[in-house]
């Protein structure tokens, strides 16, 4: 799964991404309606506003401020992840899977490894920062929809790679930079891109 990701401070590669989201016509509306400011650096958490890449009304790639978490009737906690293996079959995500796919740029994402304590009565958590090898930006795949006039998104997950499964059995669906323009294109079937998911990662212990 994925419940936190990180944006490096003063990263020149991220500057145009943040600038693009701030220039979006949606930016004033999101800032007025949602209490959280756009995450420009540091950890991004559920219900935060982050810069997201998606198609605009003219079907051209554009950056938007979006809120992390989809709400559903009768559920107090927002949904932040969706399984890439089954999202297309879920009524909540079927349309977004076909037409409203997005990319959430991050420096890396966080995952927690849970191991039993020495006495076996509790678990010991270890936090890891994970990112693709030889990549400065991690392109997380997501789905978005409009709720109350505001764009919200979930991050898609998949089975963890062999090198990461000891940390957690799930991980975000991440594509290489060359594939992201195809992911957000509604004319392309998303299943055609799943085999191109990044497979080589760096995982380092991180501070809580």
State where each predicted segment sits.
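Short linear sequence motif anchored by a di-proline
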Residues: 1-208
